[in-house]
């Protein structure tokens, strides 16, 4: 591409008489023109690449086994996005190590828009604080594409606990030091971290009971073996409506669509950021993927999640659909990062 003469060229004339250009000025001008030409070529090449994208199938890496909730949603989104992108989207399940294996594969893939990650907040954010030898850096190696949905949890209590809201619960556990037990279903997951933080902040010395899954934890809540716990709406909504569990409040920034009458803990005055964060589901890409391609992908994800059948599927999983973009998702991660780091360090949780 021909480079037009620089307007700065006029400054090298003295009156109407042309003077020899000093060597350093000549080199500066040539360097500037060369840089401008390279930048223009790079921009043109990137723009052309983005306009031609995609011209082959796109792989979505799901770092979990086939048949799980994340995998099912990935296939639903892939079907919808294929229409808008005009190319097949192929699911590639790479389970193992709490999402690390699949996420690492994406982190090391070519940043060309043909390999995507559909992951959870653990592999894309919190694992870096739980593992000392994580093979990738979420911030350095994964580019945010779109935060699909968040998964706030419900803080529930056994009916024998004489409280009905967050502030009352904090007073109760402080007044009954060492007498209250909370449950969780995964070291380093939010129910564990939030319970540990609540206990420490109130000097309550609550007992932590770890379960191999959410269902057995809820069963012990129903039986009164433990008194409180954070759980998904899917697991506890029916028990709340039947009066078998008390809904104390919801984590996250806003009320859950499936439990609209249960206020957030923040609404109740528990303003610590520890009660405002929640797990999430999102798309990522290898760092270095051209911004225009990230925006194109984000647009197609948004279109897919706005379709009623997809939105209903996400809600059925206990997630709340988000309106997102690469910039909004990146900002959310920057905001949440220190909160999760603080919670994990306070709990002492490690996974390696």
Language model: regions and residue ranges:
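An extracytoplasmic/periplasmic, membrane-proximal ligand-sensing/linker region
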Residues: 9, 17-18, 22, 55-57, ...
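Hinge/capping helix and adjacent helix->loop/strand transition within the periplasmic-binding protein
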Residues: 108-114, 129-216, 265, 270, ...
